[in-house]
């Protein structure tokens, strides 16, 4: 299923959750490296998104991005937010609350264009479980919630 960022998707099934956890655990066990790789891939594929991060100004190459402590810090925040969602799959109210709070922060404090959530979700899904409908469903749920304040 392609990742969507509006409307609704069916709830995660027990089988979805099992697949998601298996794939996620493989990536998250090396979250420092994988988080940076994901964010660098996002910025190199979508350079306009980097404009929302003043601290990343002047980081023009993948190598520059990988070496930046600010990039590493933000990459870990992103992967930990996804990890929180993965760990909250059985508590959708908790997941919803946290992601809606994150949505509000990105609107009010950072004025981030919401289209980038879906792009980043695609990079994450391609890294964690390429082509896996269960993981794409989770990323759709995350995107829909991140768009809630827009």
UniProtKB/Swiss-Prot annotation:
Entry keyword annotation includes Cytoplasm: no
Family (UniProt): Belongs to the globin family.
Full protein name: Globin-3
KW Heme (keyword) present: yes
Binding site for heme b: 74, 106
Molecular function terms from GO: heme binding; iron ion binding; oxidoreductase activity; oxygen binding; oxygen carrier activity
Keyword set, alphabetical order: Heme, Iron, Metal-binding, Oxygen transport, Transport
Subunit description: Monomer.
Species the sequence originates in: Mordacia mordax
Pfam families: Globin (PF00042)
Domain Globin: residue ranges: 11-150
Spans through the membrane: none
Record-linked InterPro entries: Globin, Globin-like_sf, Globin/Proto, Globin_lamprey/hagfish
